[in-house]
Amino acid sequence: MGQKINPIGLRLGINRTWDSRWYANTGEYGKLLHEDVKIREFLTEELKQAAISKIVIERPHKKCRVTIHSARPGIIIGKKGADIEKLRKKLSEMTNADTSLNIVEVRKPEVDATLIAQLIAQQLERRVAFRRAMKRAVQSAMRLGAEGIRINCSGRLGGAEIARMEWYREGRVPLHTLRADIDYGTAEAKTAYGICGVKVWVFKGEILEHDPMASERRAVEGDNQGSSSNRRRENA
């Protein structure tokens, strides 16, 4: 079962939490869910170059709080914060609520499954050899602290007549282990021969405490430790 199911969905409530964090009455639930889908589609389309990892939506009383996890926050913020203010106004119009917009920098995009998948998809669109793209991504992830990674590419790879699936794995990726902190991401490459799908699983170690926010907290702590060690090296 662990081989088939989305590994993030399998671990919700154990060491992962939802990207939409709000409660609603039965009558409002459908409307708010559609709003979330529209917000994510709008931001993904508007910020194609910003390397967005995920979008978290929270709804405190009559408000909306959107948090964008991005590897290139400067593109979203713009000169003197002009672009982020435009985005905030558009989101307020879409939700008819007072909307706040937060940006969280992803300091290690090389071990973020969604960003790895996007990078490989971009390389496939530029006609880079798929094996080379996969191998590069695997080496970068393992070098920066991932305990295991698996990448699947499927479709008419290299312009082949018959579609197929190729995969590459290094280290451990224990999909059945619920305490395993596994990040999962997908992307599509629109090539001249058709669409190629990319799936990425990244194993970041085990989380022993039963806490749905553990994975997110761990990522932030890891980023802070990485930035402080970089500062120490610079001072030395």
Curated annotation (Swiss-Prot):
<dbReference type="InterPro" id="IPR015946">
    <property type="entry name" value="KH_dom-like_a/b"/>
</dbReference>
<dbReference type="InterPro" id="IPR004087">
    <property type="entry name" value="KH_dom"/>
</dbReference>
<dbReference type="InterPro" id="IPR018280">
    <property type="entry name" value="Ribosomal_uS3_CS"/>
</dbReference>
<keyword id="KW-0689">Ribosomal protein</keyword>
<dbReference type="InterPro" id="IPR005704">
    <property type="entry name" value="Ribosomal_uS3_bac-typ"/>
</dbReference>
<dbReference type="Pfam" id="PF07650">
    <property type="entry name" value="KH_2"/>
</dbReference>
<dbReference type="InterPro" id="IPR036419">
    <property type="entry name" value="Ribosomal_S3_C_sf"/>
</dbReference>
<comment type="subunit">
    <text>Part of the 30S ribosomal subunit. Forms a tight complex with proteins S10 and S14.</text>
</comment>
<protein>
    <recommendedName>
        <fullName>Small ribosomal subunit protein uS3</fullName>
    </recommendedName>
</protein>
<dbReference type="GO" id="GO:0003729">
    <property type="term" value="F:mRNA binding"/>
</dbReference>
<dbReference type="InterPro" id="IPR004044">
    <property type="entry name" value="KH_dom_type_2"/>
</dbReference>
<feature type="region of interest" description="Disordered">
    <location>
        <begin position="214"/>
        <end position="236"/>
    </location>
</feature>
<keyword id="KW-0699">rRNA-binding</keyword>
<dbReference type="Pfam" id="PF00189">
    <property type="entry name" value="Ribosomal_S3_C"/>
</dbReference>
<feature type="domain" description="KH type-2">
    <location>
        <begin position="39"/>
        <end position="107"/>
    </location>
</feature>
<dbReference type="GO" id="GO:0019843">
    <property type="term" value="F:rRNA binding"/>
</dbReference>
<dbReference type="GO" id="GO:0003735">
    <property type="term" value="F:structural constituent of ribosome"/>
</dbReference>
<comment type="function">
    <text>Binds the lower part of the 30S subunit head. Binds mRNA in the 70S ribosome, positioning it for translation.</text>
</comment>
<comment type="similarity">
    <text>Belongs to the universal ribosomal protein uS3 family.</text>
</comment>
<dbReference type="InterPro" id="IPR009019">
    <property type="entry name" value="KH_sf_prok-type"/>
</dbReference>
<dbReference type="InterPro" id="IPR001351">
    <property type="entry name" value="Ribosomal_uS3_C"/>
</dbReference>
<dbReference type="GO" id="GO:0022627">
    <property type="term" value="C:cytosolic small ribosomal subunit"/>
</dbReference>
<keyword id="KW-0694">RNA-binding</keyword>
<dbReference type="GO" id="GO:0006412">
    <property type="term" value="P:translation"/>
</dbReference>
<keyword id="KW-0687">Ribonucleoprotein</keyword>
